[in-house]
Amino acid sequence: MLFTQLIILFTFISQIICVSISDLNNIALIQFTKRRGSSGHSSGGGHSSSGSHSSGGGHSSSGSSSSGSKGGGSSSGSSSGSSSGTKGGGSSSGSSSGSRNWGSNQYHCTGNSCGYGNYFAPSAAAAAVGYGTGRYTGGTKYGNNQYHCSGSTCGYGNYYAPTAASAAAGYGSARYAGQHNNSTSTKTSFGVSLNIPSTHFYVIGLAAAYSIVL
């Protein structure tokens, strides 16, 4: 009976020892594999293996490899559309070669100056008749009575007339002087300004006075 108990006890202790040794072997193998995997072959920021089984010393990475290749390589997410500005020149869209860059009388700006044609004319029509050239200067600068500005002065025709009609009648010229300057007079009554022609004003005034006397 005692002998049987000793055999059972010996068998039980042997199983415990075998299981412990097997566990120790497994733990040692896992630790060895982890150490060998973590110190894997990293080539310049390249294939960093993350603890997988390396076959024959090669770079078998079970994890993801870093994309940064040493000394160049392609950078993911690079700009697919390079800037269109060419170094040292390039063609500016819309401009034409030759002395008449804006010969089609296009509207354009350079700095703070804007206008039509080669000489920044105030309108396409002015550019078409040669604004800024020798054939445009003189008395026919604004012969079509166009509205234009020079600095802070704006008006119609050659002499900055207040309206196109006055420019057509010769505003600012000798034939215009004294003709249309004071054709109306203003009378203020009860805060209301009335623009009445001079002759009519005197006739109405005389008629009113005559009716009062009667």
Swiss-Prot record:
Keywords: Cell membrane, Glycoprotein, GPI-anchor, Lipoprotein, Membrane, Secreted, Signal. Induction: Induced by HAP43. Residues 36-101 are annotated as: Disordered. Glycans are attached at residue 182. The keyword Kinase does not apply. Residues 76-85 have a biased composition (Low complexity). A lipid is attached at residue 191 (GPI-anchor amidated glycine). Transmembrane segments: none annotated. Residues 42-60 have a biased composition (Gly residues). Residues 192-214 form a propeptide. It comes from the Eukaryota. It is found in: Secreted; Cell membrane. Predicted GPI-anchored protein which may have a role during host infection. This is Predicted GPI-anchored protein 57. It comes from Candida albicans (strain SC5314 / ATCC MYA-2876) (Yeast). The lineage of its organism: Eukaryota, Fungi, Dikarya, Ascomycota, Saccharomycotina.
